[in-house]
């Protein structure tokens, strides 16, 4: 009897576990880009404030820019961040989010604004319930490497 109670409790505990891994609704496409910050974009520095680079197409045959393109930016944490230009609510490659010149990326289709200031790309208006699809941004030796997470 004690054995069955333990098995039942274990089964209940396993069913109560929830997978909390973030899965984006934006389709997974290859992402690979290496940017020579010092040589190509010397003013794109991660020092206090938001700076943005966008790429809707690869610059070289060896690069890949995700589903709708890359939004590469710096945030208040003085780190480099990257995400896909596709709005996770609309999923339109032909209408990527656009940087507003301040702290937000705006979707021209649904009107959602995504906050870039803390490096998360989170929705602010409640239209979308999902952040922009994040990518890994690693900086070292003057080079910024963007890849899948």
Residue ranges and their predicted role:
Residues 2-10:
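Sec-dependent signal peptide recognition
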Residues 13-16:
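C-terminal motif of bacterial Sec signal peptides marking the signal peptidase cleavage site
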Residues 20-100, 118, 133-149:
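N-terminal pre-ligand scaffold of iron-sulfur
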Residues 89-90, 109-112:
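Short Cys/His-rich metal-coordination motifs, predominantly Zn2+-binding knuckles/fingers
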Residues 100, 105-108:
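Flexible, solvent-exposed short loops/turns enriched in glycine
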Residues 114-125:
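Short metal-binding segments enriched for Cys and/or His
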């Amino acid at each position: 009897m004690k054995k069955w109670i333990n098995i039942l409790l274990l089964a209940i505990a396993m069913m109560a576990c929830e997978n909390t891994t973030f899965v984006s609704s934006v389709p997974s496409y290859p992402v690979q880009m290496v940017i020579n910050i010092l040589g190509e974009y010397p003013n794109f520095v991660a020092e206090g404030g938001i700076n943005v680079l966008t790429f809707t197409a690869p610059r070289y045959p060896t690069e890949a820019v995700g589903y709708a393109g890359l939004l590469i930016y710096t945030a208040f944490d003085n780190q480099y961040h990257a995400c896909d230009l596709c709005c996770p609510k609309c999923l339109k490659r032909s209408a990527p989010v656009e940087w507003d010149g301040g702290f937000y990326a705006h979707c021209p289709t649904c009107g959602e604004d995504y906050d870039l200031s803390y490096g998360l790309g989170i929705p602010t208006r409640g239209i979308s319930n999902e952040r922009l699809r994040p990518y890994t941004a690693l900086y070292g030796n003057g080079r910024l490497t963007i890849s899948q997470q």
